Amino acid sequence: MKTSFILSASLAIHAAIVAHEKDIESLDRAIGDGDHYINIKRGSEAIAGMYNALLPLPPEEVLLQIGNKLLSAIGGASGPLLASFFMGMAKFLQLNNDKANELNSNLEHAAMFAYGVQTLMMRGKSNVGEKTMLDVLVPASTTFTHAAAQGKTVTEICKEVKNAADKGLEYTRDLVASKGRAAGLGERAIGHLDPGAKSCQVMINAVCDLILKK
């Protein structure tokens, strides 16, 4: 895991978030508070603006600072949740600091991603099936781990992870929400995709597409 890749991924994520403004906003207006896109864009923009300052730092410090910035820049529930994801990945690198700059295997990257997702789950006290971003993140993480364990190529892994994220997003359409404003809608939320899940699907696809272009 290299700092340059983390920062390139952050730029790709910001560009993808901006490109999907209408999609995310329409979903949030339907079942959310209507401010999810603004908050996510603010966070991704803030991270993109830290590029030069973060470039000299080691990966674990970059991920930690990204988490801290998201915590302060993003309002609502998304800020602490996304911050915990990046802080979790930073913690993974800190716990494996003897190879923080040598995290090169697909299995190691999958383990880092999974640690971040688990940290987010603990922070949000939520799980799959509750119409949240976890309905995208968990299957993407599980797919990443399984594909890496099977020795698949980076290209194969990225394609499978993208597919898992897409399916996870679609899965939220038929769910009743148990978190946030959407929970108050009960069965009226059925038929709508979760905006947080959509944002995560956009982010995952952006990073995978960045890798596939290399």
Which residues are covered by each model-predicted region?
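N-terminal loops that bind phosphate or other acidic moieties
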Residues: 1-214
